[in-house]
Curated annotation (Swiss-Prot):
Membrane topology category: Multi-pass membrane protein
GO biological process, one term: lipopolysaccharide biosynthetic process
Entry protein name: Undecaprenyl-phosphate 4-deoxy-4-formamido-L-arabinose transferase
Catalytic activity: UDP-4-deoxy-4-formamido-beta-L-arabinose + di-trans,octa-cis-undecaprenyl phosphate = 4-deoxy-4-formamido-alpha-L-arabinopyranosyl di-trans,octa-cis-undecaprenyl phosphate + UDP
Gene: arnC
Source domain of life: Bacteria
Residue stretches spanning the membrane: 234-254, 269-289
Organism expressing this protein natively: Erwinia tasmaniensis (strain DSM 17950 / CFBP 7177 / CIP 109463 / NCPPB 4357 / Et1/99)
UniProt enzyme class: transferase
Keyword Protein biosynthesis on entry: no
InterPro entries: ArnC_tfrase (IPR022857), Glyco_trans_2-like (IPR001173), Glycosyltransferase_2 (IPR050256), Nucleotide-diphossugar_trans (IPR029044)
């Protein structure tokens, strides 16, 4: 691997109702970046917060000698869309993403930069000694396993957003216009060299997780339908197997009636209903998956923007011009 120079680092952090953690987040992130001996910027993207997060970001961005850029979206679009909005305004050679809840310490940023300087396109992270609930750990393992099976890329922790991307990887992602985007996976599809490093994981000190059970279920559907068309192929296989089982069962009922009498076939009427319900259930599952794919095709065909930037504030300029993508 040839070492590629990094002259400027951009840190992109999506923010949604994080007013309690913002002062500590900005202080620690700025201190970590100051250790790099490189030029840097910190882009905080307000994802339609209903608290005072947006006002706090604007005040921080307007402060003298501030490295903070506030990107304000007009409403809530979701974590990954907010990050993509931040990507559209970065100017660094290396772009680092970080969650605003401080569970992944900003102090890990210099290690990501050091690893990226070895020539890697993408530097992922694996959370050590995770401070999440048992349910979150189980759900995370299931999602990671699903992604690894679907993509064939054995990255250990896709759920950790503390990651570093070379600028050409970010530019490649910005050229993708699908509505459902999962950034770590999308980045890996363009990466020639990718690696992972272990990072610390802390308990959440402020507020609650923005991922509810329903959010995790929606994320699972997003992953299934934006990663691969394997479920569609699997439906064909399952449908064929069920059809063969139904045909074989019909032959069995005919044989029982011919050789053992009508009572043998008649006594199994409730079994027939049970099998019928199984088949109907399988059809509804298949129709649901097909509906997910068709719905995503519909959204892509409409070509509506993934986000709408209402305002960008920095020490150099304050732009109120709307930008969509």
């Amino acid at each position: 691997m040839t070492e590629q120079s990094i002259k400027k680092v951009s840190v992109v952090i999506p923010v949604y109702n994080e007013q309690q953690s913002l002062p500590e987040l900005m202080r620690r992130t700025d201190a970590a970046c100051a250790q790099l001996a490189l030029d840097y910027e910190i882009l905080l993207v307000d994802d339609g917060s209903s608290d005072d997060s947006a006002a706090m970001l604007v005040a921080a961005a307007e402060a003298p000698d501030s490295h903070i850029v506030a990107v304000l979206l007009n409403r809530n679009y979701g974590q990954h869309s907010a990050i993509m909005a931040g990507f559209s305004h970065v100017s660094g050679d290396l772009v680092i993403t970080l969650d605003a809840d401080l569970q992944n310490p900003p102090e890990e940023i210099p290690r990501l930069v050091e690893t990226a300087q070895q020539g890697y396109d993408v530097v992922g992270t694996v959370r050590q000694n995770r401070q999440d609930s048992g349910f979150r750990k189980i759900a995370s393992r299931a999602i990671n396993h699903l992604i690894q099976r679907a993509t064939g890329k054995a990255m250990g922790d896709y759920g950790c957003m503390l990651r570093a991307y070379r600028r050409h990887i970010v530019d490649a992602m910005l050229n993708c216009h699908e509505r459902s985007t999962f950034i770590p996976i999308l980045a890996n599809t363009f990466a020639r060299q990718a690696t992972e490093i272990p990072v610390l994981h802390a308990e959440r000190e402020f507020g609650d997780s923005k991922y509810s059970l329903m959010s995790l279920i929606n994320l699972m559907y997003d992953l299934i339908t934006c990663l691969t068309t394997t479920p569609l192929r699997l439906l064909s296989v399952i449908g064929s197997v069920i059809a063969l089982m139904g045909f074989a069962f019909s032959l069995l009922l005919i044989a029982l009636r011919l050789f053992l009498g009508a009572e043998w076939a008649g006594d199994g009427v409730f079994m027939l209903f049970a099998v019928l319900f199984i088949f109907i259930g399988a059809q509804f599952v298949g129709m649901g998956l097909l509906g997910e794919y068709i719905g995503r095709i519909y959204n892509d065909v409409r070509a509506r923007p993934r986000y709408f930037i209402q305002r960008v504030v920095s020490r150099d300029a304050d732009s109120t011009k709307d930008k969509k993508s």
